Design a protein with these regions (language model features):
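Signature of the chorismate-utilizing enzyme
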Residues: 1-155
Length: 155
């Protein structure tokens, strides 16, 4: 699979006049699939970040027992999830992202997303036979975003 290359540019700003939710409300109407991940650990001042992820570029989704890799909305590859091949396919798809960035921010550049409760069937020897809801979402979706705003709540 051909690598998809990215170069990260960072800027630091003081964020004491805005909240993650306030920023999210501003961006969600302009950019589809904006994601807010808030820190819920207020006891420790270490690594207490919230992330606002804007404009997904690369998507990895598990739907209808298929794992697909998309770039800017176009499916590049899709393979069936069978015989416990999830980890192999996921590693293959994540390996397609070639990132050039400063080592100090490498931990912030990556995939953000979710795994649903029913997604456990891809990690364990469990086969679920629940009926899909008409408004079902992918069982697993992780995206590499064009913009990631990391808000450090204590610095």
């Amino acid at each position: 699979m051909k690598a998809i290359k990215f170069k990260s540019i960072t800027k630091k700003r003081i964020s004491d006049t805005m909240t993650p939710v306030g920023l999210y409300l501003k961006f969600r109407d302009k950019y589809a699939n904006t994601l807010l991940l808030e820190s819920s650990d207020y006891h420790s001042k270490e690594e207490s970040f919230s992330f606002l992820c804007i404009e997904p570029v690369v998507d990895i989704k598990a739907e209808q027992h298929q794992l697909s890799l998309s770039y800017k909305g176009s499916v590049l590859e899709s393979q069936p999830l069978e015989n416990n091949n999830f980890y192999e396919l996921f590693d293959q798809y994540t390996g397609a992202i070639d990132l050039d960035c400063d080592p100090s921010i490498k931990g912030f550049n990556g995939l953000y997303g979710y795994t649903t409760y029913d997604g456990v069937q891809y990690f364990e020897n469990i086969e679920l036979k629940a009926k899909a809801a008409p408004s079902a979402i992918p069982l697993l979706q992780y995206s590499f975003f064009r913009f990631v705003i990391a808000i450090n709540h204590f610095n």
